[in-house]
Swiss-Prot record:
Gene name in the database record: rpoC1
A matching Pfam family: RNA_pol_Rpb1_2
InterPro entries: DNA-dir_RpoC_beta_prime, RNA_pol_asu, RNA_pol_N, RNA_pol_Rpb1_1, RNA_pol_Rpb1_3_sf, RNA_pol_Rpb1_clamp_domain, RNApol_RpoC1
GO BP term (any one): DNA-templated transcription
Subunit structure: In plastids the minimal PEP RNA polymerase catalytic core is composed of four subunits: alpha, beta, beta', and beta''. When a (nuclear-encoded) sigma factor is associated with the core the holoenzyme is formed, which can initiate transcription.
Keyword Magnesium listed: yes
Binding site for Zn(2+): 67, 69, 88, 91
Function: DNA-dependent RNA polymerase catalyzes the transcription of DNA into RNA using the four ribonucleoside triphosphates as substrates.
Protein name (database record): DNA-directed RNA polymerase subunit beta'
Amino acid sequence: MKNKHQFFRIGLASPEQIRAWAERVLPTGEIVGEVTQPDTFSFGDNRPEKDGIFSEKIFGPIQTGVCACGKYKKQVEDEEEEEDSNFCKECGVEFVESRVRRYRMGYIRLACAVTHVWYLRNIPSYIATILSKPLQELENLAYCDHFFAGPVTNKPTLFGLKPSSFEYDEEDEFWNEIIPCFFYSFSYSPEFNEFMGREMATGGDAIQKLLANLKLKDIKDGIHREWKFFVNKKPTGDILEDLLIKRRKDFLVRRFKLIKFFIQTKTNPEWMVLSILPVLPPELRPMIRLNDGEIISSDINELYRRIIFRNNGLIDFLEKRTFTPEGVIVCQKKLVQEAVDSLFDNSMCKEPMTDLNGRLLKSFSDIIQGKEGRFRENLLGKRVDYSARSVIVVGPSLPLHQCGLPQEIAMELFQPFMIRNSIERNLVPSVRAAKLMIQNKLPFLWKILQEVMYGHPILLNRAPTLHRLGIQAFEPILADGRAIRLHPLVCAGFNADFDGDQMAVHLPLSLEAQAEASLLMLSQTNLLSPATGDPICVPSQDMLLGLYPLTIEVNRGIYGNRYNLSPSLRQIPYFYSYDDALRAKSQKLINLHSFLWLRWPVSDNLRILNSKDQEEPIEIQYDPLGNSHRIYEHFQIRKDREEKKLSIYICTTAGRTIFDQQIEAALQGFSKITPF
């Protein structure tokens, strides 16, 4: 049966969505899911505390079928009582399997909105980009160092009065005296606290209001108009002004892309500010008590506890707001913001949270990222059936779409297909006999292996798989040794080299998977980078180093005789074709760097790359019949008296002859090229 969910998407979640992940309704009508207490386990009976970060009522029982009271699920025959028997009426814990603690979530209702540190303090900052404000200004606002003055409510306010009805001149002595007196006289009164809550905003609440007031489509149209203005504007000639224009254009592109993504995914920008904080399932942040009484706990638990401590303190201050100075509430909001920042990325905080020994606590970012993170360590590197792994080595004689698969790996991967082929041919009576035959590695099995491998693609994967070229399909051929042979041109897509890198081999089983691998994932169909569109299969490193000595010149061509005392020993030989030149090289009559005259097809479109536009002949010879022989530095032409070309010879080397033949054969589509 196919799974219901075929894919998953990583993105921003709304507060309602986070609550929906965690909230459940008990048969009594009680809604559970909110974590309100920072306690973990009771030291008396070693049971999770109620409404704590390990609560059995929220996350499920520790033991299957056992509630927090220690009662077991009762077996009832009446269907009406069966629903009531699924949970304990005293403690509210459901009688379900303990594995639910691996995926049941909780949530913390924050007393104030806090900004998500990944979207605020990363570079580039998404919040700063979409608001088009300096990052430092937003950080001061998020951490309650600055206040946002404006019409927070829909009612007329002191700072929200229109200029037509209220004009405030800074030079007016009346307003300069009355406003400071107003703030000073009411700064410790309940009315002032109410005024501050209505007129001023700070912390995540202020940023949330700014994001909520954004009209994305209007901003998108404004960016489009401004971009047209800069496109039609010619360079000013001033280096500084042109640089500022370029930076502004780059910023417009970033902001336009970000807004477009928000519109396409139907995501609200204010979701980058958190009011509901999800709590991970307990099994993903375990807390273990050893035999000697020592407790080992995940750092995430301590970070959650600090958030709940500070959030509960802020709730108490807000409930007693009449008697609590506004400055104390603002400081507590800042502490909640810093605690949530430490949960997501402790390294970004100005004062990272540590344990009693001064060690930095590991946050979500530390657990997820890197080679030892959750994705690369536990999810991407899992072992699966019909797969293998080995070191890669260069296979320069292989075509681009083929790879050399070691015989030992091929025999193991294609074993089911070989068993079926052997039974269909009546070579063995049963599967067991076929496996025994394969273990003995009888000689005729290699022919069967080649038959089942023919036309069956394999997938090569090199971790980390950062883009789609990290997994490509190849046609396998048997190779000696225990290493996978790979064409050097495909290494750029894998970001691989031949210094000990390893690759995983996967075998597509179904016909659909084989067709997809052959049509979409074959290496010869993935020649362009998906990110930039530039060619990715280009020669580099060893290939360029090999082409250089193959095509290098070591003497002075036809001028070599000037510097040689024995001209007869330095005469340049003539060859009629590629084969003649390569045959002379194989007989060691010439070497790779020896100059030679190679006959070229007679054509009116002979193009010789030269530093001069029109090269003058070095020497012109005439015979009694009126035929001319013009000798140039890089070629020579024989013509009759009517200026009709009789023959053309070009000056080249044996190495360049080999290189040209290989390029010509590759362009004509030959799959096998004889090495020289």
